[in-house]
Amino acid sequence: MDDLRLLRHFEAVYRLLSFSAAADELGLTHSALTKSIKQIEHGWDVQLFHRTTRTVVATEAGKKLYPMAVELLGFAKNVRTSVQSGEHILNIVSGPAILENMIPLAIEKFARRFPNTRINVETMPPHLAVEELVQRRIHLVLYHEATLRGVAHFNRLRVRNVCDEPYWMLFRQGHPVRQAGDSLEDILGFDWAIAGFDDLFENNLSDDVQALLQAHDFPKYRLLSQAACIDLARCSDIVTAIPKTAACPLIERGEIDGLPHPGGFNFSVSAAVLYDAGVEPTVEHFVDCL
C-alpha cells in the first residue's frame, strides 16, 4: 500500500509538473511530497525529475515510469471498488451503433449466468477507449474491426471478431435515392447522417473509397446515436445506414424505407482486451453473448 501511495504522489507531480500544485491536490505539504519522491528515487536508485527553483522536468526514468504508474493505480482502484462493493463490475466501452444494436441483448443473456455482476457501458472516441483499456480502467472495448486496426496500441490487444453483417440504407418513403444508381458514387450525392463514423475507420478504407467520401464531404452529420440518425432519415431527406438485422424489421413494419448499401461496407464488430490481462470469465462470457 505504501508503494501505491508513493506512486500516486509521483503521478501527480508528473502530471502537473509542479511540486506545489501536486501537494495542494493531494493535501500534503511541499516537504512531505518532496520526501515521497526522494523515497522512490533512493529506493529504486533512479532520478525521476530534474528540479530547479522554477521548473520540474521528468527524466527518462520518470517518463518510463509514468504510464506504468497510471496503469497500476487504475488497476488498484478497480480492485478496491470491487472488493468494497462485494460484487464484480464489468466496464465496457463501445461505438454508439454497437451499444444500440448488440449490448442490450448481450446483457440479457449475460445476466442469466452472472446475475450479481454490475455492468457499465459507455461510448467514447476509440483512441480514448483503448487508452482506458491500457490503463486498466475498463475491461473490454467493442468497435468496428477497421477502427481497431488504426489505434495506437493495437499490438497490445487480443482481438476477436463477434459480428459481420451487411449495412442497409434507410430513408423516408418516396425518397429519390430509391431511383438513384446502385454505385457508391450515386448515393453519396445525398445528405447522410452516420452514428459513430470515425477517422480511424475511414483511414482503413481503400484509397479510392476515401477519395470518393472526401469529395462528397461524407458524412454531413455525425451523431453519437443510431436512433437519432434513424429519426432524421424518417422525417427528412437525410439518408443513414445501419446493420441489416436492425434495418429489416423497421422496413417490414413500414416505419421507413430501405435498400442494401451498395458500397460493400459491413458491420464488422470486434471485441478487444489486453493480451496480458489474463482470462477473466465474466469478460469472456460477455463476448460470447454478443
Residues of each region from the PLM?
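Flexible hinge/capping segments at coil-to-helix
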Residues: 154-193
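Central regulatory/effector-binding core of bacterial HTH transcription factors
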Residues: 87-150
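A late-sequence structural motif
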Residues: 257-290
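A short LG(V/I)-centered, amphipathic sequence patch enriched
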Residues: 15, 41-58
